[in-house]
Amino acid sequence: MNFYITTPIYYTNDIPHIGHAYTSIACDIIARYNKLLGNNVFFLTGTDEHGQKVEKAAINSNLEPKEFVDKLSVNFINLIPFLGCEIDDFIRTTEKRHIKASQELWKKLEKNNQIYLSNYEGWYSEIGRASCRERV
Protein backbone atom coordinates (compact mmCIF):
# COMPACT_ATOMS: atom_id res chain seq x y z
CA MET A 1 0.00 0.00 0.00
CA ASN A 2 1.17 3.54 -0.73
CA PHE A 3 1.20 5.89 2.26
CA TYR A 4 1.72 9.65 1.94
CA ILE A 5 2.37 11.89 4.92
CA THR A 6 3.24 15.55 5.18
CA THR A 7 3.91 17.99 7.95
CA PRO A 8 2.14 21.31 7.77
CA ILE A 9 4.07 23.36 5.26
CA TYR A 10 5.77 25.76 7.65
CA TYR A 11 5.50 29.54 7.32
CA THR A 12 8.84 31.26 6.93
CA ASN A 13 7.91 34.30 8.97
CA ASP A 14 10.31 33.33 11.78
CA ILE A 15 12.81 30.66 12.81
CA PRO A 16 11.57 27.15 13.70
CA HIS A 17 10.17 26.59 17.20
CA ILE A 18 9.13 23.61 19.33
CA GLY A 19 5.85 23.24 17.41
CA HIS A 20 7.76 22.66 14.18
CA ALA A 21 9.90 20.05 15.90
CA TYR A 22 6.84 18.36 17.42
CA THR A 23 4.95 17.97 14.15
CA SER A 24 8.07 16.91 12.25
CA ILE A 25 8.87 14.20 14.80
CA ALA A 26 5.23 13.05 14.97
CA CYS A 27 5.10 12.67 11.18
CA ASP A 28 8.46 10.90 11.19
CA ILE A 29 7.16 8.38 13.73
CA ILE A 30 4.07 7.70 11.62
CA ALA A 31 6.21 7.35 8.48
CA ARG A 32 8.61 4.91 10.16
CA TYR A 33 5.75 2.86 11.59
CA ASN A 34 4.18 2.54 8.15
CA LYS A 35 7.53 1.48 6.69
CA LEU A 36 7.68 -1.26 9.35
CA LEU A 37 4.23 -2.38 8.19
CA GLY A 38 5.68 -2.76 4.70
CA ASN A 39 3.97 0.25 3.19
CA ASN A 40 5.57 2.34 0.45
CA VAL A 41 5.93 5.65 2.33
CA PHE A 42 6.47 9.14 0.95
CA PHE A 43 7.18 11.77 3.63
CA LEU A 44 7.12 15.43 2.59
CA THR A 45 7.79 18.63 4.46
CA GLY A 46 8.61 22.15 3.37
CA THR A 47 7.98 25.84 3.71
CA ASP A 48 5.16 28.17 2.72
CA GLU A 49 6.89 31.32 1.57
CA HIS A 50 3.84 33.42 0.71
CA GLY A 51 1.30 35.40 2.68
CA GLN A 52 0.91 38.50 4.79
CA LYS A 53 2.77 37.09 7.80
CA VAL A 54 5.83 36.45 5.66
CA GLU A 55 5.55 39.84 3.96
CA LYS A 56 5.26 41.67 7.31
CA ALA A 57 8.23 39.79 8.75
CA ALA A 58 10.32 40.63 5.68
CA ILE A 59 9.40 44.31 5.92
CA ASN A 60 10.27 44.31 9.64
CA SER A 61 13.67 42.82 8.76
CA ASN A 62 14.27 45.42 6.03
CA LEU A 63 14.60 42.66 3.42
CA GLU A 64 12.82 41.84 0.20
CA PRO A 65 10.40 38.92 0.74
CA LYS A 66 12.37 36.48 -1.47
CA GLU A 67 15.66 37.36 0.23
CA PHE A 68 13.97 36.96 3.63
CA VAL A 69 12.51 33.51 2.88
CA ASP A 70 15.76 32.33 1.31
CA LYS A 71 17.54 33.08 4.59
CA LEU A 72 14.88 31.56 6.83
CA SER A 73 14.13 28.43 4.82
CA VAL A 74 17.66 27.15 5.51
CA ASN A 75 16.70 26.88 9.19
CA PHE A 76 13.77 24.62 8.32
CA ILE A 77 15.85 22.53 5.93
CA ASN A 78 18.50 22.03 8.64
CA LEU A 79 15.89 21.23 11.30
CA ILE A 80 14.98 17.88 9.70
CA PRO A 81 18.37 16.11 9.99
CA PHE A 82 18.97 17.81 13.36
CA LEU A 83 15.84 16.06 14.66
CA GLY A 84 16.86 12.77 13.06
CA CYS A 85 13.83 12.76 10.76
CA GLU A 86 14.02 10.89 7.47
CA ILE A 87 12.05 12.71 4.77
CA ASP A 88 11.68 11.94 1.08
CA ASP A 89 11.38 15.53 -0.10
CA PHE A 90 11.47 19.13 1.07
CA ILE A 91 9.56 21.64 -1.01
CA ARG A 92 9.44 25.42 -0.94
CA THR A 93 6.39 27.17 -2.37
CA THR A 94 8.71 29.53 -4.26
CA GLU A 95 10.26 26.64 -6.23
CA LYS A 96 9.40 26.39 -9.93
CA ARG A 97 8.22 22.79 -9.53
CA HIS A 98 5.75 23.83 -6.83
CA ILE A 99 4.47 26.77 -8.84
CA LYS A 100 3.99 24.54 -11.90
CA ALA A 101 2.21 21.79 -9.93
CA SER A 102 -0.04 24.33 -8.20
CA GLN A 103 -1.03 25.89 -11.52
CA GLU A 104 -1.75 22.47 -13.04
CA LEU A 105 -3.92 21.51 -10.06
CA TRP A 106 -5.79 24.83 -10.28
CA LYS A 107 -6.51 24.27 -13.98
CA LYS A 108 -7.79 20.73 -13.33
CA LEU A 109 -10.05 21.92 -10.53
CA GLU A 110 -11.29 24.82 -12.64
CA LYS A 111 -11.97 22.52 -15.61
CA ASN A 112 -14.10 20.30 -13.36
CA ASN A 113 -16.02 23.28 -11.90
CA GLN A 114 -14.47 22.79 -8.48
CA ILE A 115 -13.47 26.44 -8.13
CA TYR A 116 -16.18 28.99 -7.65
CA LEU A 117 -16.81 32.42 -6.19
CA SER A 118 -18.83 32.67 -3.02
CA ASN A 119 -19.35 34.88 -0.01
CA TYR A 120 -18.19 34.13 3.51
CA GLU A 121 -19.17 35.88 6.68
CA GLY A 122 -17.54 35.26 10.01
CA TRP A 123 -15.03 36.39 12.55
CA TYR A 124 -11.32 35.92 12.04
CA SER A 125 -8.69 36.24 14.76
CA GLU A 126 -5.38 37.56 13.44
CA ILE A 127 -3.73 36.73 16.76
CA GLY A 128 -5.00 33.15 16.73
CA ARG A 129 -4.81 32.95 12.93
CA ALA A 130 -8.13 31.16 12.83
CA SER A 131 -11.74 31.60 11.85
CA CYS A 132 -14.02 31.78 14.84
CA ARG A 133 -17.47 30.23 14.81
CA GLU A 134 -20.26 32.01 16.62
CA ARG A 135 -22.03 29.99 19.28
CA VAL A 136 -25.73 29.53 18.62
PLM features: what roles do these ranges have?
Residues 1-135:
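N-terminal, positively charged nucleic-acid-binding surface of large information/translation enzymes
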